[in-house]
A protein has these predicted regions:
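C-terminal motif of bacterial Sec signal peptides marking the signal peptidase cleavage site
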Residues: 22-24
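Catalytic-loop region of hydrolases
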Residues: 27-120, 126-128, 288, 331-332, ...
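Accessory cap/linker subdomain of secreted extracellular hydrolases
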Residues: 47-82, 208-343
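Gly/Ser-rich "nucleophile elbow"/oxyanion-hole loop immediately N-terminal to the catalytic nucleophile
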Residues: 103-104, 161-182, 196-198
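Short substrate-entry loop that stabilizes the transition state in hydrolases
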Residues: 106, 114-128, 133-134, 141-143, ...
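Short beta-strand/loop motif that positions the catalytic acidic residue
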Residues: 354-356
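Histidine-bearing beta->alpha loop at or near hydrolase active sites
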Residues: 383-398
């Protein structure tokens, strides 16, 4: 009924670790292909030169696993974009997807997805900027990997094995670029060091700087929480259930405003220092990181402390005192085996551009600084350019920001035009260059967002859920309006909701907010609405019932996707999307900063004239879209929209 639409990486945030590495072996490949009718929607960029690697013999194939590791593999079949061919199949223990434009320019992007949450099934995730690649003549290829564990090294290796398959089947590309998001960004760092015989350059999006930095983030949430809650090393060592210690000692302590402020200030310093959206990002990822730290401690896989803690002048404690009193999480014999091959040394074999956000609470900005230091120590600074955008989210880049970074990499590799970057060798991160943002972000403290925080219960018990979201109801229209998708932990939650001035159709005076969550695979809505608060924040109590999944929500049809003009250019964030059944306005929304629209189409019970089963037409900033849908209440449809070019 209401689809969850967000940056793909946010789905990888809530589980952690564990299958240890197993020996690799060479496997077999099988696959298929498909192609739609019709010409390419945009002319491909003509290749201007060929990589020096192009005329070399193919390197020795990278070994890969014969079978998936404790998981099943999803069907990789997919529909290509107009003007492209789809190739898909299985390569040993993983499945893959390849998309090649009819007017291929000889360029290839090897895409690496993020952490699979230890899910039961491995799937392929295409790049967010897939349309841009195909429109500009680039092919792309992506692997599911043979595991859904935290395996950045295997992601890099199995993607390189897919490159071998591509080169055998389709010929060696003129240019190849490695890229990935979240754990895939970490994999991109590894690939940029390991596969200079295959790739010409790399674009790493929100990737960790290596094993210890990557795992230390979650551990430090627990360390800082224990410190402000007064949990001692002896208490931690005596506990046989770190999760209970978090639930009963640390989280209740953080409900106190003074303790919360001390925790926030320590965490800001541990993750890079004061900067835009630092606190918002820490709050967004708090439950995820406490859960990960609990698993690290239970599995004795916490990274070793490799340096003293360093806190800034704004922290409520000195570095020396915190270093002396901070608890140490256990590291067991399995750590070395688990982390083998994950490290990033900085010895780059190719140009690398990295992209980070200031508020990322999973891969904080200090990961970019650590990477920079390692690259400098390896004598490879001439091969690194880093960019930062101010955003509160993990991998919270717009697609346009990713596209711009990719084009900068191409210009650097193929034409020698080294791009500009963000200077991170500074003590003050509060005034970074904002050149690389394509739109300003709203904050939970702005007029465009309200914050709902409080307690949630499911069938009378405190709610534990991976996601909570919100829709806003106003004059019969219902619009998805959550800023992020935070979890609920033991009934505690904090959720940002857009106001109408930030996203069309969202909250204003007279609106109701309907919160939602999941219980297993069942979508549940709160049994009562929350009135739109008069101020920027409100404390609320909400109830969900498995016997009444719709709760107080009306039945709507939901559509989501991206908006392009007929020249292949993406419409910018902020555009207004309207949905009509005949001449009746039945839905309104904005194109979000991520270039995604999510719109609810009301049914006849909410607005007369919004006929169930009727055709739905879409208008974007006054322009009629070429696509249409059907008003089918309680259904969700992905639908990209195309409007006339200006």
């Amino acid at each position: 009924m209401y689809a969850v639409v967000t940056r793909s990486c946010r789905w990888w945030s809530y589980a952690l670790i564990a299958a240890l590495l197993v020996p690799a072996c060479t496997g077999n490949a099988d696959g298929g292909s498909s192609s739609p009718d019709g010409p390419s929607s945009a002319a491909a960029d003509a290749p201007r030169a060929r990589s020096p690697l192009r005329d070399r013999p193919l390197p020795e194939p990278v070994p890969y696993r014969d079978a998936p590791e404790g998981i099943t593999l999803a069907d990789p079949a997919f529909e290509p974009l107009p003007g492209a061919d789809a190739h898909f199949g299985r390569l040993g223990g993983a499945v893959y997807q390849i998309e090649i434009p009819h007017a291929w320019n000889g360029g290839l992007v090897m895409w690496m997805h993020g952490f699979g949450e230890l899910g039961p099934e491995a799937t392929v995730a295409p790049p967010d900027f897939r349309r841009y690649l195909v429109a500009h003549g680039y092919a792309w290829a992506a692997s599911s990997y043979s595991s859904t564990s935290l395996i950045p090294q295997r992601g890099a290796d199995e993607t390189a094995a897919l490159w071998d398959h591509f080169a055998r089947e389709h010929g060696r590309p003129d240019w190849t670029y490695a890229s990935g998001l979240s754990m895939g960004g970490w994999s991109s760092h590894i690939a940029a060091e390991r596969y200079g015989d295959r790739y010409d350059g790399a674009l790493a999006l929100c990737g960790a700087a290596g094993t210890v930095p990557g795992l230390r983030v979650s551990a430090e949430y627990l360390v800082a929480g224990a410190y402000v809650a007064g949990v001692t090393q002896a208490e931690l060592d005596a506990s046989d259930d770190v999760g209970r210690l978090v639930e009963e000692r640390i989280l209740p302590a953080l409900d106190d405003p003074g303790t919360r402020e001390r925790f926030d200030r320590i965490m800001v310093d541990l993750t890079g220092g004061p900067r835009a959206f630092a606190v918002e990002g820490i709050h967004d990822e708090e439950d995820t990181n406490f859960a990960r730290a609990t698993l690290l401690a239970a599995a004795r896989l916490a990274p070793p402390r490799d340096a003293p803690y360093r806190l800034g002048p704004d922290s409520p404690v000195t570095s020396e005192e915190f270093d002396r009193e901070a608890v140490v999480l256990p590291t067991g014999d399995g750590y070395d085996e688990f982390s083998a091959g994950m490290e990033v040394t900085g010895d780059l074999a190719m140009p690398l551009i990295t992209l980070h956000t200031t508020g990322d609470g999973q891969v904080p900005i200090n990961q970019a600084q650590i990477l920079r230091d390692r690259v400098e120590a390896a004598g490879r600074s001439d091969r690194l350019v880093q960019r930062v955008v101010e955003d509160p989210g993990h991998c919270g880049f717009s697609t346009a920001e990713q596209e711009a970074a990719f084009q900068a990499l191409v210009d650097w590799v193929e034409h020698g035009d080294r791009p500009e970057g963000t200077n991170l060798a500074v003590d003050d991160l509060t005034d970074l260059d904002r050149t690389f943002e394509d739109h300003p972000r709203v904050t939970s403290e702005s007029d465009g967002v309200v914050t709902l925080r409080g307690r949630a219960r499911l069938d009378g018990e405190p709610l534990d859920a991976r996601w909570m979201g919100a829709v806003v109801r106003h004059d019969g229209l219902v619009t998805p309006c959550n800023v992020t998708l935070p979890p609920s932990d033991n009934g505690r939650f904090e959720l940002g909701v857009y106001a109408d001035e930030a996203s069309a159709g969202c909250g204003r005076r007279g609106s109701d907010v309907l919160l939602w969550t999941y219980a297993g695979d069942q979508r549940l809505f709160a049994t009562a609405p929350v009135p739109w608060p008069a101020a920027g924040a409100a404390s609320v109590e909400v109830e969900f019932s498995t016997s009444d999944p719709l709760g107080a929500a009306p039945a709507i049809t939901e559509f989501s996707g991206e908006v392009y003009d007929d020249a292949g250019h993406r419409r910018e964030a902020g555009g207004r999307v309207e949905a009509y059944v005949s001449t009746t306005l039945c839905g309104v929304a904005s194109i979000r900063g991520s270039e995604i629209y999510v719109i609810g189409v009301a049914g006849p019970d909410s607005i007369p004239g919004c006929t169930a089963g009727g055709p739905v037409r879409f208008v974007v900033d006054g322009d009629e879209a070429g696509e249409s849908g059907t008003n089918a209440p309680e259904q969700s449809t992905h639908l990209d929209l195309t409007v006339p070019a200006p």
